[in-house]
A protein has these predicted regions:
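Residue-level preference for the first positions of well-ordered beta-strands
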Residues: 24-32, 54-56, 101-103, 139-141, ...
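Substrate-engagement module of ASCE P-loop NTPases
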Residues: 115-116, 121-148
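A conserved helix-loop-beta module that forms one wall/lid of the active-site cleft
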Residues: 282-347, 352-372
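Glycine-rich P-loop/Walker A and Walker A-like loops and their local beta1-loop-alpha1 context
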Residues: 6-61
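Conserved mixed alpha/beta core segments that line enzyme active sites in large multi-domain catalysts
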Residues: 147, 268-271, 275-314, 369-768, ...
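C-terminal regions of RecA-like/P-loop NTPase motor modules
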Residues: 2, 184-221
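Phosphate-binding/switch region of NTP-binding enzymes
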Residues: 145-197
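Conserved inter-motif catalytic segment of the P-loop NTP-binding fold
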Residues: 51-114
Length: 857
């Protein structure tokens, strides 16, 4: 059969008038009611049966069936899910399986609004389905209801389909006016036609009397100009707002607003509905670009603020009001469809191309183009913020839910927001594309795969937040920022209470509080003893202080990481006194040499000494933990004035997974000393366990130190290769590395991503004083949260009393199989892969007694 071959519609006169429906045609019927669609669908089905065509009816709507049951028609029921991607892919797979020359009928596309709440996604469904049907030489009939969709939505359908036919009826006649007939033309084709259902006559209207009657019918269905541009999403919200303004019951409307805009997580839905007022929903909609969900991060931020407002109004008075915008999840799919990326998106979902297509897809996401309509909405955000910096943050549908934090898996991008409007728009668009592309990062894909989320819709909504802070010269930053944990079982001092909560506090932007930065340490604060520190001398406090500050450089159009002396001169004296401490020992040493020099370091002492502020942050977290019925972590900023006033900006809140130990490990008491490879105390983080180790991967500290700097990342890649080799093979592996794992600085340790180490049972960081490598767990960092969620044991080998025994030379007794993973002779000298599977090598961790032993049996 040749493509574009004429077929019979069951109405011969219509075939003549339209020069026939052809193979490949998608025929959209815009009707006032579905009975009008049946007038044309029934003859089409009857004719297809006569012609021995294969006929498929896609049934997904709640309306009465459009096709009667008969053996010649295959009815395929597809549950109408709120998950656009799942629904669309299911239909595509069926179409692909059915193959060429199939005749289709679809339920009413207008019904898709009940699941997706927006014209945008209905249009996206049609725009990806219609071309696919066209390539298979099918014929498909689709009804849509007149007046249900905006002009923009219908225009997208019109631009995609081959035929769009408008049907009108009165008591006497049925009228058809073609709006589009692709690749066909005649003198009368686009005139209104009268269809006589009894005789099958289909004639163009040529006389004035009939034309007058047609336009009388047409006039009944006209909408005002404003209504034509209003889609179902806006109509719903406008109706809900009208009910609210007229003091009518809005309970049902609020439930719907929560379900279609806020979250799909049932626990979070319950809390949102409990704490949100109708005005809260309207405020979200008023600050929203596009449609769909605002995502987990945005929902958590808004919910936490509503909880504080409702249950702690005194604290709410010091909360900085948010002025965020939300880019809805539908914009993500629309961007993919607009740029022709849908095919690669569908392929990437499949098991065989899940990882292999990710990089190509990410590159496409970075290089796509936004529609003019979307750009105009982005300009609204730029006009609102003026030239103040803002940040574009991921807020995916699955992110920050119960059990799925996605900590550090997706990008956040700061925008300095300076320059011409065109330059600022380009910077904003590039930031959005970068976050979109991060959904295809190896770490994100691996995280979703390990947690069974790889088949779920992961639409990327965005949270756009003005950077909270002040200007210090050309630098812009908050006075302080941090992450907080309502519960932290990992004590940096023996006497602190895990239930009191803990902070990682930094000066400047909060990125330094969640990343492992070279030689820089955030201030750890236990909220029962805020001023307590594990350092006993000023020299130690200085050594283990925050060395680098991050701020938005408005002149350089970037985020800049600076040493303290680069920004200290811009700080007003009152703020310097709050954030900085004097190193009196160092100053005295200089004076003894005749030098009068002020030596200060970041300690945030003025903040942790503020008892009211510390109590309020603690109260916020305990309040949220009580409402969530689960530990939480928050992100926040603190800004302070010279008068002593301050404001807290609550930027994020999500459920926090913590280890809940299931029992005491059985560590034998009679282990011979010569059998012990490692024994330490008070150095581990993770559940109690007794596990037989199959492989031990050791990065030799001295060999790694002597390795050229530019080659060090190859060690991380090799570890990743080992991880991926054993992925899903139920191997218990131990990784031993010098310094910090997951650091961005190779001179501090091995710069792996979490995806590189996700298959390991345990991670061991090794101190090596000669090379300057120091373990550092980084409580609260993204790598910390990854280890907790994956239940990977962390331990450290310190050169102090915590390490009772460490005999790495014993590992040489096992076969080194590194050659299975690399032929690089230099890497073979640095990385060793010891196969312990044929002999018994046991790892025991006793969380209760804080003791770990790795030994040979």
């Amino acid at each position: 059969m040749a493509a574009f071959e004429r077929i019979c519609s069951g109405i011969p006169d219509m075939d003549q008038a339209l020069d026939n429906i052809r193979l490949g045609d998608n025929v959209v019927w815009r009707v006032s009611n579905l009975q009008e669609f049946r007038y044309f669908c029934e003859p089409y089905i009857e004719q297809a049966i006569k012609d021995n065509r294969r006929i498929v009816y896609f049934r997904f709507a709640s309306h009465e069936p459009l096709v009667k049951e008969c053996p010649q028609v295959e009815r395929i029921e597809i549950p109408l899910s709120h998950r656009f991607e799942d629904f669309t892919v299911k239909i595509h797979k069926i179409i692909e399986k059915e193959g060429f020359d199939v005749f289709y009928v679809f339920d009413c596309l207008s019904e898709l609004q009940t699941a997706w709440a927006t014209d945008l996604m209905m249009g996206n469904f049609f725009r990806v389905t219609c071309p696919f049907l066209f390539t298979l030489d099918t014929v498909a009939f689709f009804p849509i209801i007149r007046g249900k969709h905006s002009f923009h939505a219908v225009k997208k359908i019109l631009n995609t389909t081959q035929l769009l036919l408008d049907v009108y009826s009165d008591r006497r006649n049925t009228y058809v006016r073609p709006a589009k007939v692709w690749n066909r033309d005649s003198e009368t084709m686009f005139r209104p036609h009268i269809y006589n259902r009894e005789t099958g006559a289909f004639r163009p209207i040529l006389d004035g009397v009939q034309s007058s009657r047609f336009y009388q019918v047409l006039d009944k269905f006209q909408r005002t100009g404003e209504e034509q541009f209003t889609d179902s999403w806006n109509r719903f919200f406008n109706t809900a707002k009208m009910l609210y303004d007229n003091h009518m019951n809005t309970d049902d409307a609020c439930n719907t607003m929560c379900n279609i805009m806020m979250t799909r997580d049932e626990k979070l839905r319950f809390m949102v509905k409990k704490h949100f007022t109708p005005q809260d929903y309207f405020n979200v909609r008023n600050h929203m670009i596009g449609t769909g969900m605002i995502g987990g991060k945005a929902c958590g931020m808004l919910l936490s603020r509503a909880i504080v407002r409702n249950l702690a109004p005194d604290i709410d008075e010091v909360l900085e009001p948010h002025d965020s915008f939300f880019i809805g999840s539908d914009v993500y799919y629309t961007y993919i469809v607009d740029n022709g990326f849908w095919d690669i998106r569908v392929r990437q979902r499949e098991e065989e191309e899940y990882f292999s297509l990710a990089e190509e897809f990410a590159q496409k996401l970075k290089n796509g183009v936004f529609s003019e309509e979307m750009q105009n909405q982005f300009l609204h955000i730029l006009e609102y913020y003026g030239q103040d910096p803002f940040i574009v943050r991921s807020s995916s549908i699955l992110e920050d839910g119960f059990g799925n934090a996605f900590a550090g898996k997706y990008e956040s991008v700061f925008c300095a927001n300076r320059g011409t409007l065109e330059e600022r728009l380009l910077e904003f668009e590039n930031a959005i594309k970068t976050v979109y592309a991060s959904s295809m990062s190896l770490s994100a894909l691996d995280y979703r795969k390990r947690r069974g989320l790889d088949k779920r819709d992961e639409q990327m909504a965005l949270l756009v937040q003005r950077v909270s802070g002040s200007y210090y010269g050309s630098y812009y930053m908050p006075c302080a920022a941090g992450v907080g944990y309502s519960y932290s079982p990992y004590k940096f001092l023996e006497q602190i209470d895990p239930k009191a909560g803990m902070l990682r506090l930094v000066m400047g932007l909060g990125t330094a509080a969640v990343d492992r930065t070279e030689g820089s340490y955030p201030r750890l604060v236990s909220l029962d003893m805020p001023q307590a520190t594990s350092c006993t001398t000023i020299a130690e406090k200085h050594q283990f202080s925050q060395r680098k500050v991050e701020a938005v450089d408005t002149s350089g159009h970037c985020v800049r990481q600076m040493y303290l002396d680069q920004i200290e001169g811009f700080l007003p004296e009152y703020l310097a006194n709050i954030l900085l401490d004097h190193d009196f020992d160092a100053e005295r040493s200089f004076r003894e040499r005749g030098i009068n020099r002020s030596v200060r370091f970041i300690a945030c002492s003025g903040i942790v000494k503020n008892q009211i502020l510390m109590k309020q942050i603690q109260d916020i977290m305990q309040l949220l933990q009580k409402e969530y019925e689960y530990p939480v972590d928050i992100e926040f900023t603190v800004n302070l004035s010279e008068t002593g006033e301050y404001s807290i900006n609550l930027l994020q809140c999500r459920p926090l997974k913590v280890f809940k130990d299931i029992g005491k490990a059985q560590i034998p008491e009679d282990i011979a000393e010569e059998k012990i490879i490692l024994e330490n105390v008070h150095s581990s983080m993770g559940l109690s366990r007794n596990v037989k180790i199959d492989h031990i991967v050791l990065v030799d500290p001295i060999a790694y130190y002597n390795m050229p700097y530019v080659r060090k990342p190859n060690v991380a890649k090799l570890i990743g290769t080992i991880t991926w080799k054993y992925k899903g093979k139920n191997k218990h592996m131990l990784l031993m590395v010098p310094g910090r794992i997951g650091t961005s600085s190779p001179e501090l340790g091995v710069p792996t991503t979490f995806a590189d180490i996700s298959e390991f049972e345990a991670i061991c960081e090794i101190e090596e004083k000669k090379a300057g490598y120091n373990p550092e767990l980084s409580y609260g960092s993204h790598i910390f949260q990854d280890l907790v969620e994956a239940e990977i044991l962390y331990t450290a080998v310190f050169a102090n009393e915590k390490t009772l025994r460490f005999a790495p030379e014993k590992l040489a007794e096992y076969p080194d199989i590194v050659s299975l993973f690399t032929e690089d002779p230099e890497l073979k000298q640095v990385v060793h892969v010891y196969d312990t599977s044929k002999v018994s090598c046991e790892l025991c961790n006793d969380l209760q007694n804080e003791r770990l032993v790795l030994y040979q049996q």
